[in-house]
Amino acid sequence: MIRTPLRPLARILDARAQGMNPKGIERENLRLRREQARDAGRRRAEWRLLLLAALFFAGYAVIGARMGMLAATPVVESEPYAGEGISGERADVLDRNGRILATNLVTHSLYAEMRYMQDGRRAAHELARIFPDLDEEALARRLTDPDRRFYWIRSRVSPEQAQAAHDIGEPGLWLGPREMRLYPNGTLAAHVLGGTAYGQQGVTAAEIQGVAGLEYTADDRLSDPDLADVPLSLSLDLGVQSIVEEVLGSGIQMLHARAGSAIIMDAQTGEVVALASAPTFDPNDRPAPPTEGDPADSPLFNRAVQGLYELGSVMKAFAVAQALDLGLVTPQTMVNTRGPLRIGRFEINDFHDYGAQLSVEDVFVHSSNIGTAHLAQMIGPERQRDFLRQFGFLEALPIELPEARRALPQYPDRWTEVSAMTISYGHGLAVTPMHLAAAYAALVNGGTMVQPTLLRRPDTTPGPRVISPETSRIMRSLFRQVVTRGTASLGEVAGYGVGGKTGTADKPNPQGGYYDDRVVATFAGAFPMNDPRYVIIVTMDEPQETVGGVERRTAGWTVVPVAAEMVRRIAPVMGMRPQDPAVIDAELRLR
């Protein structure tokens, strides 16, 4: 029984009357009240803990349920930037031996989603450290622009850059997977491959499009999803291409030339085994096309198929071949070489005085302009024009490069007698080195035209006949003599029977006439000349060699040694064994 507190006097007296101690009763009452209060507080605390635990449990349950929903639901990106329907697949490009020239590599893009951006200025500062070419202030303005939802920072980043961007820890910076085009050999065969760029882009995919070279011409084939696993095989030989580019580059540097090009072509099939143009570029980091100045000054300019040049004396081969094929002359026919040769107000001279006359054989071997002009007179303008048309000199070449299709040869509107004479020794008709390669293949392969190609072509149908097999045989002998006793004596490569023709043409002056001290030097030939397998064309723009204190610009002193070095190095790579020079020359001796 709980006792009630005593009243001050009455209860004290009452307690004493009953024999109890009032103080003890009061202490007991106080103790009981404290226990009651303590029990009530404990019950309230227990209820509070239960309520707090229930709230925590409910909160965690909601978070867990939301996380489960997010994990089970596929990510939906912002519709304007998604990659649905965009294919980045692209077939590999291989050389003739299966070595990779172009392939795809998985990489990332870097972009910003403003709705998630926490600190745009900090992000811009950190990104500028990763990408030094970025304008930090301009980027900061874009990343903090409240009206902007999305911004491309980089369409392609390296794995190292992607990791560094991720480490910034900014929720508004996103990395999107995509494929990029990779050229593992750098500048090698750059002018053949051309390059690619991104077309339609999304954050998870980007369309790779060819913008130049073979990547452009074969774009539909390379981007066909059904053929993504079927590589495109080219006629190029990576080993030969590497040697040709190295030797050409060294030659240009040594001869202080402005530029140059080189072509190695199968004389029977027209397959281009190597094509080089210098200066060059890296298709992995393709420069922008020039917007002003001379396009030929750009490293993107493919001099082998775009450069239109008056090629000089290498064109004499066609005047001689036509005169022989028409039966107008034989190699021993004597031709007037007394100079100068005057036609109206025009005057034709030789580099050396060859006397009153030379045989057709020696006109070609010693490169007489006057003698060749007399042959052109015998042929006549109409027949000459028709003959050169058969060799493809009057139209663009149908090779698999878009740049070549825009290179239209330049020739006179009126093909007069004077035009025929100057064209016979390489002035007045501007063509590309690739035109010359295809035409020289026909001169040495027995007389049938070939169509130049950059694609692997194991089986070919012979082209139309342009000269007789006998004329081709005579031309092979004359080409060989140019090397053994003529203007290309520095082109001899023991055991490989090199033959060809030199050409040194004064460059046209845009103001009119020709420069006195600027030339285009060319060597056009084939090897081995007793059974021609490959045509070689080397052209340099403004080469110059100093010998004994004398400046020399002619092809015999400049491009011929470069061509010889190419043959010396590529012939073994192409599986060719040296032959006995006496046997080669015996087979080529004119009967």
Where does each model-flagged region fall?
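Periplasmic/cell-envelope proteins involved in peptidoglycan metabolism and beta-lactam response
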Residues: 1-289, 308, 326, 382-394, ...
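Beta-lactam-recognizing serine transpeptidase/beta-lactamase-like catalytic domain environment
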Residues: 30-33, 102, 262, 267-313, ...
